[in-house]
Amino acid sequence: MSSGGLLLLLGLLTLCAELTPVSSKDRH
């Protein structure tokens, strides 16, 4: 189990959340 894959997944998730912060604010 390489931590590289986990890091990549985490990075992608964070990127998605940072790139689409409007969807979360739009709900408000």
Swiss-Prot record:
It comes from the Eukaryota. Keywords: Disulfide bond, Ion channel impairing toxin, Neurotoxin, Potassium channel impairing toxin, Presynaptic neurotoxin, Secreted, Signal, Toxin. Residues 1-24 form the signal peptide. Expressed by the venom gland. One of its GO terms (cellular component) is extracellular region. It is found in: Secreted. Its main location: secreted. The keyword 4Fe-4S does not apply. Beta-1-bungarotoxin is a presynaptic neurotoxin of the venom. The B chain is homologous to venom basic protease inhibitors but has no protease inhibitor activity and blocks voltage-gated potassium channels (Kv). Heterodimer; disulfide-linked. The A chains have phospholipase A2 activity and the B chains show homology with the basic protease inhibitors. This is Beta-bungarotoxin B chain-like. It comes from Bungarus multicinctus (Many-banded krait).
